[in-house]
């Protein structure tokens, strides 16, 4: 099959956009090469020519549109890395929510990502390695700085999950929210309002977690102080050692 090289870029872009829509709608297994080519208005052999098959196309769709979304909504939403950590966290939350909820191009990207999380394909490992894990490390670093005192990896992970979970709720429940409260969470002003709420709610949780960690560190330090008369550590009442867990 001959291809007009002058239109190669345009053809490739049409395939990527059409494939993203089809994969988001039907999933990897339900999407067919024929459906994608019909949507893109290209020859059925074009997918093999440009991408080497459906599976490689799927991986490229995830990478291409994630890069597009990050370019549109950078990880910190324009907040500099030298900005206060609280502002960086706010930027992170805003960016994540806009990538999930924005109705602009590509509006289907959030749906496609959710599909991959719930119905993993062979592209899942690459998705985790190139997209999810780097984002997770950034958020974990911010959370650790916000808490301030030494905390376990598990505690940081729980805090990160709580922040991400709040954001995902508004994506997964957007239809129910609209029906119950007549609130369209895909509108920019609503996304900003949600971001403010998630930020404030998360700040309170992180502050409580920080105090919890400080109290525990203090108790552990006191337990190591030896009694000058006996040379043994004083007994701390059981109730004083038990600090209510945050989560």
Where are these regions (language model features)?
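Short hydrophobic clusters on alpha-helical segments that form packing/core surfaces
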Residues: 15-23, 163, 202
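Hydrophobic alpha-helical bundle segments that form small-molecule/ligand-binding pockets
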Residues: 133-157, 180-183, 206-211
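An amphipathic alpha-helix adjacent to DNA-recognition modules
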Residues: 9-17, 50-78, 125, 129
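Helix-turn-helix
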Residues: 14, 22-56, 60, 64
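Amphipathic alpha-helical segments used for helix-helix packing
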Residues: 104-126, 174-180
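Amphipathic alpha-helical packing segments from all-alpha helical-bundle domains
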Residues: 87, 121-147, 196, 200
């Amino acid at each position: 099959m001959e291809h007009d090289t002058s239109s190669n870029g345009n053809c490739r872009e049409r395939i990527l956009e059409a494939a993203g829509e089809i994969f988001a709608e039907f999933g990897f297994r339900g999407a067919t090469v024929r459906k994608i080519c019909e949507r893109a208005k290209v020859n059925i052999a074009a997918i093999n020519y440009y991408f080497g098959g459906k599976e490689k196309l799927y991986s490229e769709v995830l990478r291409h549109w994630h890069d597009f979304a990050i370019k549109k909504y950078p990880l910190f939403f324009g907040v500099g890395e030298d900005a206060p950590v609280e502002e960086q966290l706010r930027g992170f939350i805003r960016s994540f929510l806009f990538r999930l909820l924005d109705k602009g191009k590509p509006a289907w990207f959030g749906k496609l990502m959710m599909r991959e999380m719930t119905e993993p394909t062979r592209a899942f490992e690459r998705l985790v390695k190139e997209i999810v894990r780097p984002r997770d490390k950034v958020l974990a670093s911010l959370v650790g700085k916000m808490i301030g005192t030494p905390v376990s990896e598990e505690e940081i992970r729980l805090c990160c999950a709580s922040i991400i979970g709040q954001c995902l709720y508004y994506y997964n429940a957007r239809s129910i929210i609209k029906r119950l409260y007549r609130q369209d969470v895909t509108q920019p002003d609503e996304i900003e309002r949600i971001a403010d709420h998630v930020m404030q709610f998360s700040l309170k949780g992180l502050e409580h977690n920080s105090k919890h960690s400080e109290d525990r560190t203090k108790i552990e330090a006191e337990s190591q102080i030896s009694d000058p008369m006996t040379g043994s550590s004083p007994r701390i009442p059981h109730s004083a050692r038990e600090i209510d867990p945050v989560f």
